[in-house]
Amino acid sequence: MTELVIHLAPHDAFHFLKENPQAVLIDVRSEMEFLFVGHPKEALSIPWRDEPDWEISPEFLARARRATSLNRPVVLICRSGHRSSEAGLFLQANGFSAVYNVTHGFEGDLNDQHCRSSLNGWRFDGLPWEQC
């Protein structure tokens, strides 16, 4: 299968969302990450994998379909861009036609001290976010 998910840097994803108000931003991290680490403003929480087993959520596809339509652009974000890329391929395989992934995710890559949010990512780039 050819990877068709379009990868956008955080700033590019933010501008894409502003220029395409019909697009939906879905945060695929766990509910706890979404609530306690923070999330992009206006993101919907639809976990791809969640506690306690970190298995693919059997409700993911149905929840994504309820949140948007197959033809609307969907922008996915996770912690570092890996889970969202995987979820994007799954959505495409299930009929979604315009799927985008935020590279580096919300928290970004690990630095030399194994800390996130210090090299790249949505939060590092100073894009709008909130914490519950």
What is each model feature region?
Residues 27, 81:
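Conserved G/P- and acidic residue-centered "switch" motifs that form tight phosphate/ATP-binding loops
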Residues 76-77:
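Short, surface-exposed ligand- or partner-binding patches at beta-edge/loop junctions that are enriched
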Residues 1-23, 31-73, 84-132:
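Rhodanese-like catalytic fold shared by cysteine-dependent sulfurtransferases
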